[in-house]
Amino acid sequence: YKRQGQLYRPVRERDVDMLKQYAIDMLESTGQEEISLSSLSSSDYSRLEELVTFLMDTCRERMVNISLPSLRIDAFSLDIMSKVQDVKKSSLTFAPEAGSQRLRDVINKGLTEEVILKGAAMAFEGGWTRVKLYFMLGLPTETEEDIRGIAELSNKIAALFFETVPREKRTGQVQIVASTSFFIPKPFTPFQWAKMSTKEEFLEKAHLTKTAIREQLNQKRIKYNWHEADVSVLEGVFARGDRKIASVILKAYEKGCLYDSW
């Protein structure tokens, strides 16, 4: 359902030697303390193990974190996770996208709750205590039950930590960071003609999610963030607007919009 998967077919991969050189150049020129592997699905990169092993050797002496965002839980490798944790643990990011199995099937996410929980258990067993979960609000056919499912799934993952990791082996308190963005219909995708929620509806959905999280047994272990509704509405206009939008953007610039987030 995401635009990238529709527009950029077929799948193409960067040369692993090129990525290694990029990593070295960026670490030497920026002094950053974390390097991230960013793609639509990092865990599907065919040379991931080789690349991570190289980064381990490169980053260990500099005490640089390695971050693996955009992981598909069903493709996640315990071996890769074990290698990354040898430097410094930051957080792991998973993207269930929806709180219920029904809605995940609607958007063709292809993840079951069993697979999600198994992936989280692997993370906890690997020594991680901080897991980020990405969801989307306002998806086509969404119901209140789907929204509450976000809180329930987050709670199950938090509870899984205590079930998976013995007390004597816990290196810290578990924290689940549940983040929601708002669905924005994009051209050239299966949902390009789907209805987009209003700002008020976005806020209502976010507040419902927050309330549902507060009702969970492990709510103190769950932190909730959501995307700005105002910015999401603007993104919707830009996504489906035509060339007439150019004059609007120019006018906004002339009125002082220079470094605004949108």
Q: Residue spans of the language-model regions?
A:
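Radical SAM enzyme core and accessory elements
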Residues: 216-262
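Contiguous mid-protein beta-loop-alpha structural module that forms a pocket-lining wall or clamp
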Residues: 145, 182-186, 199-201, 212
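Flexible helix-coil linker/hinge segments at domain or subdomain boundaries
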Residues: 162-169, 210-225
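Core structural elements
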Residues: 174-184
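Conserved SAM/AdoMet-binding glycine-rich loop
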Residues: 24-175
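Short glycine-enriched, charge-decorated loop/helix-capping segments at active-site entrances
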Residues: 106-111, 192-198
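Canonical Radical SAM [4Fe-4S] cluster-binding loop centered on the CxxxCxxC motif
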Residues: 2-17
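Acidic, Ser/Thr-rich peripheral helices and adjacent loops at domain boundaries
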Residues: 84, 91, 196-210, 245-257
